[in-house]
């Protein structure tokens, strides 16, 4: 549904010269769409809006017949080939693998902290909540890991959820009710 809304906003400007495009209206509609889907608008997007409005004004003065999409297509294709190349994916995977040991330690500490009662708090009467959380994490992890794109590095949140869910379900054997 979100994709269709974005397509509805953006398709009317494809293959139009710069003189026929209002970036102000385009960005306003994009922000309205984001709000409609309860998405937070990042400060960087406001800066992007300002930059695009400046480009629009300058472009209309210098070359109003410019077709941005035709002009930008070779640059965007080259950029995408570079970003999705095997070397770029390997570099991305390597960077994420370097973070995994820290992430695993932080996740374990957080899960163990959830399992221990807070200082001065009464001991939990029902540990079913942790089991339910474990089952939810396990199910979510399976869904995320199975729907991950071809880039294996993007699947780590699903695997992390899967591992956390398994930990919460298995740890009950060490700490029975």
Curated annotation (Swiss-Prot):
One of its GO terms (molecular function) is kinase activity. It is an enzyme of class 2 (transferase). It is found in: Cell inner membrane. It comes from the Bacteria. Its main location: membrane. The keyword Nucleotide-binding applies. It is a multi-pass membrane protein. One of its GO terms (biological process) is ubiquinone biosynthetic process. Its EC number is 2.7.-.-. Is probably a protein kinase regulator of UbiI activity which is involved in aerobic coenzyme Q (ubiquinone) biosynthesis. This is Probable protein kinase UbiB. The lineage of its organism: Bacteria, Pseudomonadati, Pseudomonadota, Gammaproteobacteria, Pseudomonadales. The gene is ubiB.
């Amino acid at each position: 549904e979100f994709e269709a809304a974005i397509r509805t906003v953006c398709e009317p400007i494809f293959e139009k010269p710069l003189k026929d495009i209002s970036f102000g209206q385009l960005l306003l509609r994009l922000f309205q769409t984001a709000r409609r889907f309860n998405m937070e608008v990042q400060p960087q997007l406001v800066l992007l809006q300002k930059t695009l409005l400046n480009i629009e004004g300058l472009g209309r003065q210098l070359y109003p017949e410019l077709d941005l999409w035709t002009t930008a297509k070779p640059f965007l294709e080259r950029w995408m080939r570079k970003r999705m190349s095997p070397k770029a994916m390997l570099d991305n995977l390597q960077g994420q693998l370097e973070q995994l040991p820290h992430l695993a330690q932080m996740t374990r500490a957080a899960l163990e902290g959830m399992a221990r009662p807070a200082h001065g708090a009464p001991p939990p009467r029902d540990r079913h909540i942790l089991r339910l959380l474990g089952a939810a994490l396990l199910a979510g992890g399976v869904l995320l890991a199975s729907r991950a794109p071809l880039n294996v590095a993007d699947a780590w949140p699903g695997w992390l959820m899967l591992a956390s869910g398994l930990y919460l379900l298995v740890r009950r054997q060490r700490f029975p009710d």
